[in-house]
Amino acid sequence: MNLDNIINILFKHMELNNLVDDSDVDNIIKQFPESVYYGEMYRCMNVVGDIQVTDIWQSWSSSKESACLVCDGLRSGIQKGSKRVVLKQNSIGIDLIKLLRLIKQMDISEEQKKKVCRLLRSYRYEKEILARINYTYEIVE
């Protein structure tokens, strides 16, 4: 996988907040093993009965607090009687800030540098993890 492909995958992830194929995550890890993230990931949801009522594509976060902040932001307009559910799973993924800093240190074109800097600016507020989601999780709250 060449660098342009990796950068394009990261833009796709940022713009669409979509899940990236496991094979893409594996290939990036092979090329940049220093960027690997092992650890717990959290997702917070509002649930009424058995029905999840917050955005189904809400992303996983590296801390329970940041996951709940995102969920709290979605609470307006949620039905009365909903309860908060926090899921935790152990994940392998890519620390995107580490990855982008590693790429930035490489001998890359000016166009690639601009794209990497744009991605870094968009990820600067919290630790952003590109993870393989395997849906083996436990309910922690």
Go through the PLM ranges and name each one.
Residues 1-41, 48-141:
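Conserved NAD+-utilizing ADP-ribose enzyme module
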